[in-house]
A protein has these predicted regions:
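Catalytic His-Asp segment of secreted/periplasmic serine-dependent ester chemistry enzymes
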Residues: 243, 291-377
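N-terminal secretory targeting modules
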Residues: 2-7, 17-189, 367-377
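Structural recognition of the beta-strand scaffold that forms the well-ordered cores
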Residues: 189-192, 222-225, 248-253, 282-286, ...
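A general structural detector for well-ordered alpha-helical segments in enzyme core domains, enriched
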Residues: 210, 266, 270, 307-314
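Oxyanion-hole/transition-state-stabilizing segment in secreted/luminal serine hydrolases
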Residues: 202, 206, 214, 232-277, ...
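Short helix-loop-beta junction
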Residues: 211-224, 316
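Catalytic nucleophile-elbow at a beta strand-turn-alpha helix junction centered on a G-D-S/GDSL motif
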Residues: 187-211
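Glycine- and acidic-residue-enriched helix-capping/strand-helix junction motifs
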Residues: 102-106, 200-208, 301-305
Length: 377
């Protein structure tokens, strides 16, 4: 009996010693300290006068704007947080406003986050925050196992849900603070107005929205004023766009939700609000994409053609009135020739967004050259 107890004790000590040797030199589990993201730089907003840090519409609009539009204003599409840290691990803890779900879009795009790192002047994707399935509060490690080196980071917030709180977790021995590099360059943003597609439907994660792709490609802040089902040329949105102090370019991409009669009735008045506030700022007008379903759906084909005819007539009206610095993007190249690029025939996948950006980029660059408001390198 004694020999059995002794053998067991020896075996236990041996196993403990082996475990100690195996763990020798291994780093201890990181102890994280969380920081409220509002301590850092929040970008991608037309105004800071919002109910919460991650809203897109002014608090003053709560009682005056349409309820549907106000609700979508809580969605944090296009908003980002910029910071720097030398932490070897970055974790996010965030709470969604609605806990939204859609059957044609990935949860990581609806209410997730993603992380980018600035390396030699360019932004690179480095991690995604996947939302919790059954809880509005989510925690996710965005990146880990890095060298302890100070880097500049950007977190894009959820596209189709609001964010009520966001905390960034870093190693307790790390330094974290506001960014030291102005990228994306701020001060003269591109202000884009549009529908669910512009809001980000239905890309896989927030950084793939085409406003964000343009933002990184041009190294310029882009304000996403995409409102799913609600880009109806409301004048309060025109006034919000006009309130941006030094916009570089305005982009009007509302045709996918505005029928031809609404475009005919309200576009010039909407444009006039922008032009009265900023007479020399270029305006880019974008046609309705040619959806793949147009091939067989006769009613949809006729509707889209009518909308684009109305959009072109709006542009021609401005041109004949002597308006300068107005630009037009036709529909033909907004999707690829085979029309592969949508999840449901309407909303763009990541592939569709890349085609869109390729199509609009030359016109936006031309407009930027003509703009009186430029950001310096």
């Amino acid at each position: 009996m004694k020999s059995r107890i002794l053998a067991t004790a020896v075996a236990s000590v041996t196993m403990l010693a082996m475990a100690f040797v195996a763990n020798a030199g291994q780093p201890e589990k990181e102890e994280l300290v969380y920081h409220d993201a509002t301590e850092f730089l929040i970008g991608g907003k037309a105004t800071q006068k919002t109910l919460t840090p991650y809203d897109r519409l002014p608090a003053s609009y709560e009682k005056t704007t349409r309820p549907e539009l106000w609700r979508h204003g809580h969605h944090s599409a296009g908003i980002y947080v910029r910071f720097r840290t030398d932490s070897p691990i970055i974790k996010a803890r965030w709470t969604s406003l609605y806990g939204a779900y859609m059957n044609h879009m990935a949860p990581s795009g609806i209410r997730g986050l993603d992380l980018y790192v600035l390396d030699e002047g360019k932004w690179y994707f480095t991690g995604v925050g996947r939302p919790s399935k059954n809880d509005k509060t989510s925690e996710y490690v965005l990146v880990k196992n890095m060298d302890r080196k100070e880097r500049e980071y950007m977190i894009y917030l959820s596209l189709y849900d609001g964010v009520t709180s966001l905390e960034i977790g870093v190693d307790k021995a790390s330094v974290i603070g506001k960014p030291q590099v102005d990228s994306p360059r701020r001060g003269c943003p591109i202000v884009m107005y549009g529908t669910s597609i512009l809001q980000g439907g239905c890309v896989s994660r927030p950084g793939m929205a085409h406003t964000s792709l343009l933002e990184r490609a041009l190294d310029m802040e882009v304000i996403n004023l995409g409102f799913s089902g609600n880009a109806l040329l409301d004048l309060d949105i025109a006034q919000l766009m006009a309130s941006v102090e030094t916009p570089a370019v305005y982009v009007l991409d509302n045709a996918p939700i505005c029928r031809a009669d609404r475009i005919n009735a309200h576009s010039v008045e909407f444009f006039r609000v922008l032009r009265d506030a900023h007479p020399d700022v270029p305006v880019v007008i974008v046609e309705h994409p040619l959806y793949p379903t147009m091939r067989l759906n006769n009613a949809e084909r006729e509707d889209i053609i009518a909308r684009n005819n109305a959009q072109k007539a709006f542009y021609e009206t401005l041109r004949k009135a002597g308006e300068k610095r107005i630009y037009y993007v036709s529909a033909e190249k907004l999707l690829d020739e085979m029309k592969e690029g949508t999840v449901d025939g309407d909303h763009f996948t990541d592939l569709g967004v890349t085609y869109y950006v390729k199509a609009v980029m030359p016109t936006i660059k031309k407009a930027l050259k003509a703009s009186p408001n430029k950001v310096g390198k």
